[in-house]
Amino acid sequence: MREETAEQPAPLRSGLTTGSCATATSLAAARLLLSGQISDAVEIVLPKGKQVQMRLEFCRRVDNFAEAGTLKDAGDDPDVTHGALVFARVRQEAAPGVRFVAGAGVGSVTRPGLVLAVGEPAINPVPRRMMTEHLLRLAEELGYSGGFEVTIGVEGGEALALKTMNPRLGILGGLSILGTSGIVRPFSCAAYIASIHQGIDVATTNGYRHIAACTGNASEDTMRRVYNIPDIALIEMGDFVGAVLKHLRKVPVDKLSLCGGFGKISKLAAGHMDLHSRHSSIDLPQLALWAAQVGADAALQQQILHANTSQQALAMCAAAGVPLGDEVCRHALAFARSVVPATVEVEVFAIDRQGGVVGQAGVALSKEHT
């Protein structure tokens, strides 16, 4: 009889950033423009020196410009741009250097606070540098002394951008061309964390000294209801509360409101910076201990230890008149205060699934606005 063994999971596959796609397509288009060479694939050098070959969907000459396109391959990362067509159109210019233009599906910066100036196409610094280095190297090889106008676009990018933080950051009209290493690491969440940092930067640069960091839509709605806070000052942190707290060391605000579901706030109270279930779990013994500190008897503590969920434990305490929600928020507040500068006023809200507040700490209910 054949012995069955557990199948080993295959390693997750890395992909390439939109910045790498833009570099490959602009290089292919420029080469066609200057030498007449049509490419079906092109090799580029990533920022750390690794060489990669990228397949092209098209490479053609049209009137006074050349264009090339490639499909974004994010590997096994759940990237919103996976499978999108990234394209470049390149024209020659008399002045040396490279000038970037936002094509269809690539956004433009409309608010200060980002690394790019207002009015600039949302093509981040590393992709700009990658494209510039490749194009200037090509120009030197071919003896070309002029410059390039490079238009980068993403097919369907305007619709895809609505699934990102771009509209809230003031990047309108499409996606950003991103990447610092040129490689997409599966589930690294680097882009999400970068968007959290950008959100804080944009809010503070535009004069908002009170921000609310929220785990999801329900907590954002709660913050709007409590403070009538504008979207620009709402930071969609998801599970990455650590990204918010640590960034405030560099970019402090006057006031930080943290709002999330009771379970996630209980993880923060236990000292976790990443609230996702992959990295932290509900600690029922700790909940029982906190409940005991605010009046839970031994029988209720045992019930909490055998609860199926944190919400069930909270409901048990509510029925017994034990303010577990507030106690958890107090511990979350203490931990958050230990991370951010002492000058930052912090408050914490825990909510239920309907967005109702089930616990709070550090809250001066003056309804002050930003």
From Swiss-Prot:
Pfam families: CbiD (PF01888). One of its GO terms (biological process) is anaerobic cobalamin biosynthetic process. It catalyses: Co-precorrin-5B + S-adenosyl-L-methionine = Co-precorrin-6A + S-adenosyl-L-homocysteine. The keyword Glycoprotein does not apply. SUPFAM superfamilies: CbiD-like. Gene3D superfamilies: CbiD-like. Its EC number is 2.1.1.195. Belongs to the CbiD family. This is Cobalt-precorrin-5B C(1)-methyltransferase. It comes from Pseudomonas syringae pv. tomato (strain ATCC BAA-871 / DC3000).
